[in-house]
UniProtKB/Swiss-Prot annotation:
Membrane topology: Lipid-anchor
Record bears the keyword Zinc: no
Organism: Lactococcus lactis subsp. cremoris (strain SK11)
Protein name in the entry: Oligopeptide-binding protein OppA
Pfam family, one: SBP_bac_5
Described function: Part of the ABC transporter complex OppABCDF involved in the uptake of oligopeptides.
Annotated GO biological process: peptide transport; protein transport
Family note: Belongs to the bacterial solute-binding protein 5 family.
């Protein structure tokens, strides 16, 4: 699975399926045939017919923004492309995991952890090759760290978690030309890499832990590209090398990818002759399924569910979304030079009471009931229920609207209601905020305007950024470009999460994706406690997670919005389809039972 990183999703109402960005990116053991359930959904489709030889799979990802093709994981932050890269290896992920996201053997590489020596030894398969037939080497693994830690490449993936590797902080700061903590026992052209840590962490047995990387990048192919040009080079956008069962034959910028089998793939030979993967707009996706244009569409949102649940020729699969939607407050800026969030913005939102009041004023349950078709529920915390071993029903958040409590909090903070305007004032200044809501599904505008009206009920004046919703990719750039913009106060985000639930990479003091730029010593302590040696004890780690969730809700630097079930309509000619998080070889196993799509 592609779990080394968190990925932004376009919809903040309900999170869409990221099918097969995960299930196919590393290609693992075998397609699940278990009758797994998620809510009322089947997780896998059991086609009674066998796959024919060959065939072309027609797939789409629903998005109203163009995909941003970038095959190097360290330089990518686009959920659309993260999913669409799956047949090629999901940006070249290495490791197999079980359904609980723990590393297992048998993938493109294996990892062995040694607590005494504080090391991880990564061993690449001897037959692991790039799609041009060249060997995947130890240097290719190390090069991925360079693309993230060297500021010249422009990556926004640097975090405190990676700083736990010996020498990587010095390399990041320009104090060293090489990474002393990453060595090659058999040389750079060998297949073994040793990573030296400052300390071991309890989450290191889980994929997506963030303490070491899980991908490779073709060093020999890319070494002559200047760092500043790498993100825009055809070698990483339209003409990449990959390690998956398929390779891209043609990439149309922003629109589509045509895949054909990779003859150098180390695993099982794919059943299909080709895969066509396109971007389809929200306005056209349901009609496309109704006319049997696609075998399945990723990224469909809850508001469309009623339109597709009974479509002839399709079976709707579902899974617990490994995702969270939330609301951010803009509290500071990101100091890229020192890799630190600085909470220094002059705003009423620095007051905890104001942040809590805005959270309590939202009617998230009403919104979910009206627009999600039963696929989302108000979130009580930032940890989704798929990580049930780290959550607790005792954690109370902002699931229920409480206008009385919101008004009381603002009263206590000295914000007086001006009856002539209907808005609150303090020290001669009106409580007026800018809401950087962005395009999502068809209901995004309605939901944003609804929240603006709820905030008006407690005397908080909120207006949309430039009077309208932001285009999604523009919003991403606005939020992720250091030091961060000072022209917004509130925004919404949705994340496809890593499969190790520690949230260092989202909310640590150094995390670039800490969009609100808060920096709180108690939250830092909570995050560090979750990843401390004491948390090797599962009971202790759960307690640490619960405290973290409670503290985040109390301080309200961000406010949880929804948990979700994701769903995907699958044409009944498809064979071997599953959303099981433990299925790693889906792109090799998937096939079709007929040349034409099913219509009944």
């Amino acid at each position: 699975m592609n779990k080394l990183k968190v990925t932004l999703l376009a919809s903040s109402v309900v999170l869409a399926a990221t099918l097969l960005s995960a299930c196919g990116s590393n290609q693992s053991s075998s397609t699940s045939t278990k009758k797994l359930k998620a809510g009322n959904f089947d997780v896998a489709y059991q086609n009674p017919d066998k796959a024919i030889k060959g065939g072309n799979l027609k797939v789409a990802y629903q998005s109203d923004s163009p995909m941003k093709a970038q095959w190097l994981s360290g330089l990518s932050n686009d959920a659309t492309f993260a999913t669409m890269s799956g047949p090629g290896g999901g940006q070249d992920g290495l490791f197999f995991t079980d359904s609980g996201f723990k590393f297992i053997k048998g993938g493109a590489a294996d990892v062995a952890l040694d607590k005494e020596s504080k090391t991880a030894t990564i061993t690449l398969r001897k037959d692991l090759k790039w799609s041009d037939g060249s060997e995947v080497t130890a240097k290719d693994y190390e090069f991925t760290y360079e693309t993230i830690a060297n500021p010249a490449y422009g990556s926004d993936r640097w975090t405190d978690s990676l700083a736990n590797i010996v020498g990587l902080s010095d390399y990041h700061a320009g104090k060293a030309k090489t990474i002393s903590g990453i060595t090659f026992p058999d040389g750079e052209n060998g297949k073994v890499i040793k990573v030296q840590f400052k300390e071991m962490k309890p989450g290191m047995t889980q994929s997506g832990n963030g303490y070491f990387l899980e991908t490779v990048a073709p060093y020999q192919y890319l070494k002559d590209v200047a760092p500043k040009d790498l993100a825009s080079s055809p070698k990483t956008t339209t003409k990449p090398l990959v390690t998956g069962p398929f390779k891209p034959e043609n990439v149309v910028a922003g629109e589509s990818i045509k895949y054909v089998p990779n003859p150098y793939y180390w695993g099982k030979k794919p059943k299909l002759n080709s895969i066509t993967y396109e971007v389809v707009s929200t306005a056209k996706s349901v009609a496309a399924l109704s006319s049997s244009k696609y075998d399945f569409i990723n990224g469909m949102v809850s508001s469309q569910y009623k339109q597709v649940k009974n479509l002839k020729g399709y079976k709707v699969l579902g899974q617990q979304a490994m995702a969270i939607s939330l609301m951010y407050y803009n509290l500071g800026h990101y100091d890229a030079k020192n890799s630190i969030n600085v909470q220094d913005r002059k705003t009423p939102l620095q007051d905890q009471n104001v942040r809590q009041a805005i959270g309590y004023a939202r009617n998230v349950a009403e919104v979910a009931n009206k627009f999600s078709n039963g696929l989302s529920t108000p979130a009580n915390s930032l940890i989704p229920p798929i990580f049930k071993q780290f959550t607790s029903s005792s954690v109370k958040g902002y699931e229920k609207q409480d206008l009385d409590k919101a008004n009381k909090l603002l009263d206590e903070d000295g914000w007086k209601l001006n009856k002539s305007t209907g808005y609150r004032e303090k020290d001669g200044k009106e409580l007026s905020l800018v809401y950087a809501a962005h395009v999502g599904d068809a209901n995004a505008e309605t939901i944003a305007q609804n929240y603006i009206q709820q905030w008006k009920k407690i005397g908080v004046k909120v207006s949309l950024y430039n009077g309208k919703l932001m285009e999604f990719n523009s919003w991403v750039d606005h939020m992720t470009t250091p030091p961060g913009a000072n022209d917004w106060d509130i925004t919404d985000g949705s994340w496809s999460l890593a499969s190790e639930p520690s949230q260092q990479d989202l909310f640590s003091a150094s995390a670039p994706y800490n969009f609100g730029h808060f920096n709180d010593s108690e939250i830092t302590k909570d995050l560090n406690d979750i990843d401390s040696a004491k948390s090797e004890n599962p009971t202790y780690r759960k307690a640490a997670f619960v405290k973290y969730q409670e503290d985040m809700n109390k301080k309200a630097y961000v406010v949880p919005t929804n948990f979700s079930l994701s769903y995907t309509p699958v044409n009944k000619r498809v064979v071997g389809m599953t959303l099981d998080y433990g299925a790693m070889d889906t792109w090799s196993e998937i096939g079709v039972s007929s040349a034409k799509l099913a219509t009944k």
